[in-house]
Amino acid sequence: MKGIEKLKEGYPLLNKLIATEEVFWVNPNMEKYETAIKDSPLSEENVKDAEERLKRFASYIAKVFPETKETKGIIESPLLKIPSMKQALEKHYKQPILGELLLKCDSHLPISGSIKARGGIYEVLKHAEQLALQHGMLTEEDDYSILDSDTCREFFAKYSIAVGSTGNLGLSIGIMSAKLGFNVTVHMSADAKQWKKDLLRSKGVNVIEYEADYSKAVKEGRQQADTDPSCYFVDDENSHDLFLGYAVAASRLQKQLEELEIVVDEEHPLFVYLPCGVGGGPGGVAFGLKLLYKDNVHCFFAEPTHSPCMLLGLMTGLHDKIAVQDIGIDNVTDADGLAVGRPSGFVGKTMEPFLSGNYTVSDEELYRLLKELADTENIYLEPSALAGMIGPVKVCKEDAYLQEQQLMKEMKKGTHIVWGTGGSMVPEDVINGYYKTGERLTI
């Protein structure tokens, strides 16, 4: 790896990053959609395939998770207008936000209460389908609700699934795998919240805890799977399936925007702000949106000031060859789902030509935003889920991107979507604690 001083010379923004100051970075490597898609390892067909698979599983999901009955087994979340929060942001930051502000409430996705219910559940279902098809338990024409049987559960019990997680991915993989009958182990990093570990154990999931960070938990999970041929490892750092499970969100969002009569085209740009840890969730969603809206959607990743792994990897072009610890950042943040020191090389390289930019936000700011959203809209999220909320302020304030893309004229007719990634399953006492922290920091 290049020496840190050399890197600082080439990338002056690194000094602020190392000082854990909030930064806003415009991606100089973004390309026009038509150019970017030519070199992409994934395509629209891959996303459509994932979408079809989720439809095949819908009857099973509706049967085993009654909370999805209303949506007929499709795991989806609301898209809400948040005008009071918009006013509060404008007032607090003394910055007008041009265009409408909405919140995508993946915090309230059924089954596991976070964005990870998309990718995590999809990858487990795909693995289950492959096993069941291989062993003649199922054909693609069957009603997949037949998987809810003792025979199928006994069959899946011969196999195991492992994953390394800071929390939310572990919840989605653990809950789904256990429901199907798999033996499942979640390797959890030091920053994983206790309630998440307790919930998993209550579902019969084997939780292994580590004193180290996320990368160590993933490494241990990978090693466990390597020694056991019947064990399937969900690789958060490199998984195409996780990524595609997240990408399906885009066509669902498109329908919701149409229902709200919100237009997305050249004169009505769409801005989407996605909290980013290792990168799979935000990367998949952004990729799906790019397939649909091409150059009319502008995606920004949001990271904690103490864990800016994707920004560091993208800015230096080193991707997973550099970790925040290499430049003296501690990777300690209350935004547990984003506490990742080394980004996914697969996601970074795949998204580099599509991504508009990246910014960081402090833990203190996350708590203040958490309290503000609760006060103005009565919506409670976990700290990491608020990382996107400051995005519209940053984009409008640091208008270099808008000038460069010649968007200033269109902004009033634009739409901002903040992706609320998790929070509905957080126990009440924990949420109250978060709120009190926000209160203390606001005074």
From Swiss-Prot:
Residues found modified as N6-(pyridoxal phosphate)lysine: K116
Coiled-coil residues: none
Domain of life: Bacteria
Protein name: Probable D-serine dehydratase
Classification via InterPro entries: D_Ser_am_lyase, Ser/Thr_Dehydratase, Ser/Thr_deHydtase_PyrdxlP-BS, TrpB-like_PALP, TrpB-like_PALP_sf
Assigned EC number: 4.3.1.18
Keyword Lyase included in the entry's annotation: yes
Pfam families per record: PALP (PF00291)
GO function terms (MF aspect): D-serine ammonia-lyase activity; hydro-lyase activity; pyridoxal phosphate binding
Keyword terms: Lyase, Pyridoxal phosphate
Reactions performed catalytically: D-serine = pyruvate + NH4(+)
One biological process term in Gene Ontology: D-serine catabolic process
Organism annotation: Bacillus cereus (strain AH187)
Cofactors required: pyridoxal 5'-phosphate
Family: Belongs to the serine/threonine dehydratase family. DsdA subfamily.
